Amino acid sequence: MAIFHYTVKIVGRSKGKSVISASAYLNGDVMKNEETGRISYYTSKKEVVYTRLMMCENAPPEWQIVPEENIKRFQKSVRYKRSEDKEAALEKFKITFQKQRLWNEVLKIEKNADAQLGRSFEFALPKEWNRQEQIQYTTDYIQKTFVDRGMCADWSIHDKGDGNPHVHLLLTMRPFNPDHSWGKKEVKDWDFLRDKNGNIVIDESHPNWWQDKKNPDRHGIRIPVLDENGIQKMGARNRLQWKRVLTDANGWNNPKNCELWRSEWAKVCNEHLPLHNQVDHRSYEKQGKLQIPTIHEGADARKIEQKFLAGQEIKGSWKVAENQ
């Protein structure tokens, strides 16, 4: 039976997360963080069965060039010489090199201590699909949902052969300009008056009503900046001052996106699954089911449980549980 699992997280500096390490993990490879000099090793992860980098239209084309000297150096390595399929090994090296370049470029532009570096996804693949179908349907979904909208996608398929094939995906969070330079994540806009539900109040008769002449859909009641006497402040050239806020420049951080992305993936799954085996991205509550959702354990939790059940020596918390 097909299952639906789809999680989205942010890889950011504030939590001490490394986007280089995250990429190395999902690719099961070695990557170097040029900012810190640290190297992340995940070559022991044998479950990586497919990996790919999909660059958006405005991304710098030179980031996909792998210097000949790097290729020659890799071909002299023990890893290359021991590989059974040298052509496949070289191809994976090139892809990993390109991904390493992408995320190191992200680190160069995202310098703030609280900077968001990448958006991380993990979602299940129906085990009813064969490998080629998994690759094709996932590629189409990522291209249409993310890459066509200006994001670069670093992704791979993990499959241990235990009936749980899944995708790890890492997306860039800053757009590119048409000239291939980095764009802005946020722009300043008027802080419009909103109701208790967070919606912009519409009242064209209000004295502070404002509407963009070039974009009529951009409108609202502006909020004045007041001094200690409750009088609206004046700025340069005696212009009235209005409150401004930073807003998402491209809409990628809209909280509603997560539900949209989940529903689009569910649609892809159901288009390629029989009617009796459809998936539903909605929560049990929204489906009207009186059922307690399961909790995603993760690999580490399963390993601990296996040790506990096997009676191996473990930490005190598990020993207490064993004696209850």
Regions found by a protein language model. Name each.
Residues 1-324:
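N-terminal nicking endonuclease/strand-transfer module with a His-rich metal-binding environment
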